[in-house]
Swiss-Prot record:
Protein name (database record): Peroxiredoxin
InterPro entries documented for this protein: AhpC/TSA, Peroxiredoxin, Peroxiredoxin_AhpC-typ, Peroxiredoxin_C, Peroxiredoxin_TDXH, PRX_1cys, Thioredoxin-like_sf, Thioredoxin_domain
Induction trigger: Up-regulated by hydrogen peroxide (at protein level).
Family the UniProt entry places it in: Belongs to the peroxiredoxin family. Prx6 subfamily.
Length: 250
């Protein structure tokens, strides 16, 4: 329905957006390159939680690129604010932000995507849209303004979606460390009685029942890459960036 908030499985709404990298047409800019993209909104530039998020996204930028995924931010701030904030982050924290940020001072884009906070029409919530190479929305995530995102989980989601697409499998909870089937991927269930019976008799898959079968078609590299995201999210940083930046500034 035109004007309604988009849903998972729908094509991302067509729009032209102004960013600090210039005007970008969504989703065609990425679809024409055969790329997925992650659009994520933040409440405001020059705020602490948002700064920590952008540093985290930037430090994982190459991980997203290896997956064939581009990043694009969004807030109701101006292009000039985005530019100065990026400069501040690089100068004071030592991290360059390589991806564009949409400037949406009127809230037009945020309103179209359902990203405005119920109690503040001037701030976007921490939303995430994961959009595939066809321009179809595959995942939508919403976080409150006071909680920063776990960027390694967003990487894991993208990795799992792309792997599931290529192998025609569904991905279980906590993959690749699921407590029932480990790194296994779930085989789509049969749709007829004959198929269900044949599946149980064939022994092709490991099964708890005809509707719950799995195998392990993912490569070791794919599994270990996903585990690396989880390990990094759980590990304590060897050194805090603010300490490095403070040393550099002084």
């Amino acid at each position: 329905m035109p004007g309604s908030i988009p849903l998972i499985g729908e094509r991302f709404p067509e729009m032209e957006v102004t960013t600090d990298h210039g005007v970008i047409k969504l989703p065609d800019h990425y679809v024409s390159q055969g790329k997925w993209f992650v659009l994520f909104s933040h409440p405001a530039d020059f705020t602490p939680v948002c700064t920590t998020e952008f540093v985290s996204f930037a430090r994982r930028y190459e991980d997203f690129q290896r997956l064939g995924v581009d990043l694009i931010g969004l807030s109701v701030d101006s292009v000039f604010s985005h530019i100065k904030w990026k400069e501040w982050i690089e100068r004071h924290i030592g991290v360059r932000i390589p991806f564009p940020i949409i400037a949406d001072p009127q809230g037009t884009v945020a309103r179209r995507l359902g990203l405005l906070h119920a109690e503040s029409a001037t701030h976007t919530v921490r939303g995430v849209f994961i959009v595939d190479a066809r321009g179809v929305i595959r995942t939508m995530l919403y976080y409150p303004m006071e909680l920063g995102r776990l960027v390694d989980e967003i990487l894991r989601i993208v990795k799992a979606l792309k792997l599931g697409d290529s192998l025609k499998r569904a991905v279980p909870a906590d993959w690749p460390n699921n407590e029932i089937i480990g790194e296994g991927l779930i085989v789509p269930p049969p749709t007829t009685e004959d198929q269900a019976r044949a599946r149980m008799e064939s022994g092709q898959y490991r099964c708890l029942d005809w509707w719950f079968c799995w195998d392990t078609p993912a490569s070791r590299d794919d599994v270990e890459e996903a585990r690396r995201y989880l390990r990094r999210a759980a590990e304590k940083p060897a050194k805090l960036l603010y300490e490095e930046a403070r040393t550099h500034l002084h």
